Amino acid sequence: MARLYVGNLDPRVTSGELEDEFRVFGVLRSVWVARKPPGFAFIDFDDKRDAEDALRDLDGKNGWRVELSRNSSSRGGRDRHGGSEMKCYECGETGHFARECRLRIGPGGLGSGKRRSRSRSRSRSPQYRKSPTYGRRSYSPRDRSPRRRSVSPVRGRSYSRSPRGRGGSPYADGRDGGRYRRSRS
């Protein structure tokens, strides 16, 4: 099986229209057209040679970009990202991922198998592992209340401009130049 990515599609194109264009090259397994966001589709061929023929003839036609998909398997989990070349982190074998590894899963189901031990430098120190509150954060009531903005005036007072300092730039000497003064109302 081979999967083609078809990009730069008109948002109104239907799976039937794509099926008509691609089925002349060989047997199709499925046609999936994206709707959110629109503009691309995946076409699954039974035979990789048929997909390559379609790629050669249809790439650029109607402004489409057609290329072999990097994920050429529709089965969930296995062979994703070229799984035959990827190695398992648990056992080092190719063809599966660590979450599917028989060493990790074991005979009793998920999590019952033996895992490789981590290096000493990456393990947590004992006092953190034994602490029941490790990873929890305690919040004080002060943390939960919204912070007060320091720029808002204190009740009972208002700020007004003083006529002094209106001539030059208020920032000429790095301060406000006396432009804003507080006065009681």
UniProtKB/Swiss-Prot annotation:
Question: Which stretches of sequence are listed as region Disordered?
Answer: 104-185
Q: Which Pfam families match?
A: RRM_1, zf-CCHC
RRM domain residues: 2-73
Q: Which UniProt keywords apply?
A: Metal-binding, mRNA processing, mRNA splicing, Nucleus, Zinc, Zinc-finger
Q: Where is the composition biased (Basic residues)?
A: 113-123
Instruction: List zinc finger spans: CCHC-type.
Output: 86-103
Localized where?
Nucleus
A biological process from GO: mRNA cis splicing, via spliceosome
Instruction: State the protein's purpose.
Output: Involved in pre-mRNA splicing.
What family name appears in the similarity comment?
A: Belongs to the splicing factor SR family.
UniProt name for this protein: Serine/arginine-rich splicing factor RSZ21
